[in-house]
Amino acid sequence: MSHSKIKAGGHGSSGIGNDFTPAKTPAPATPAPQSQQVNDLLGRGVGNALNKSNLGSDSQTWTPGSTMVSLKSRSSSSHKPDTGGDTKPDSTSGGKRKRDDETDPNAETEGGKKKKKRDDENDSSQAGGAGSSAGSSGSPEDALMNIALQRAIQRQTQTRQKMQEAMKIKDDDD
């Protein structure tokens, strides 16, 4: 098996070279993964797909870091509900996170009812002086943090629901 791979990858002894430059093997040997890369772009975010494809570290030179970071954080947090990854990209990406909220149709449709309730909770907590209420009137940082917290809470509730649904399905199977 290893012989055929080396032959497909290049010319005879260049198998050693392929070990150092893996970018050469996927293109000639397996043309199929390109569609998988496109799926990665759509499904998991640009950052992951670029890291898997030939571009790798070059991508950071021409892709603005903030958009890659925000896409990565969205994709990783959908798998694990911890909010640790969310706080960092928000501080660097400026207003981009806000634009994500407006253009993301899933956020509105999936958690529409929950979102309304959460807005009420946020309003009441601000009125009660929950620390950030003093500065939230003017500073965009607080507005961004509120959005980040809302999205983190929304993600947690969504993942919790998915877990519960999965448990129900498991129970049905048993």
Swiss-Prot record:
Skewed-composition ranges (Basic and acidic residues): 79-89, 162-174
Primary localisation category: secreted
Disulfide bonding pattern of the chain: none
Annotated Low complexity bias: 66-78, 147-161
Subcellular location(s) per record: Secreted
CC annotations in GO: extracellular region
Keywords from the named record: Plasmid, Secreted
Source organism, top-level taxon: Bacteria
Annotated Polar residues bias: 50-65
Region feature Disordered, mapped onto this chain: 1-174
Function of the molecule: Probably involved in host-pathogen interactions.
UniProt protein name: Protein PopB
Organism: Ralstonia nicotianae (strain ATCC BAA-1114 / GMI1000) (Ralstonia solanacearum)
